């Protein structure tokens, strides 16, 4: 309520998750919301991005990847999991992530 008042009474969507906020703003059921930049992919014609918050305020948003140990997996499944893991870390995958607004230019 305080933020809404500070912005002149603008309705702010407070949803369960940022995807719901994005949908509410895109559909026009609220005027403004905060979401991940990567979630805006495909909504460019329905949204005006007002501000991209810098990493010094938010910190890096990290999506970890790992391979779990699965004693029930056969050799083919285990090899496929390892191949997928390697692909996700590859330059080719980084280009895909970048195309969908994920920033891959971070320190490891």
What residues fall within each predicted segment?
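Exported/periplasmic ABC-transporter solute-binding proteins
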Residues: 1-108
């Amino acid at each position: 309520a305080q933020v809404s008042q500070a912005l002149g009474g603008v309705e702010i969507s407070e949803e369960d998750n940022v995807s719901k906020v994005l949908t509410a703003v895109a559909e026009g059921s609220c005027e403004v919301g905060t979401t991940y930049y990567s979630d805006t992919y495909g909504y460019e014609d329905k949204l005006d991005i007002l501000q991209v918050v810098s990493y010094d305020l938010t910190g890096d948003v990290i999506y970890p990847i790992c391979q779990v140990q699965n004693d029930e997996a056969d050799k083919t499944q285990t090899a496929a999991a390892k191949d997928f893991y390697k692909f996700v870390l590859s330059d080719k995958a980084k280009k895909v992530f970048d195309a969908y607004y994920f920033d891959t230019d971070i320190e490891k």
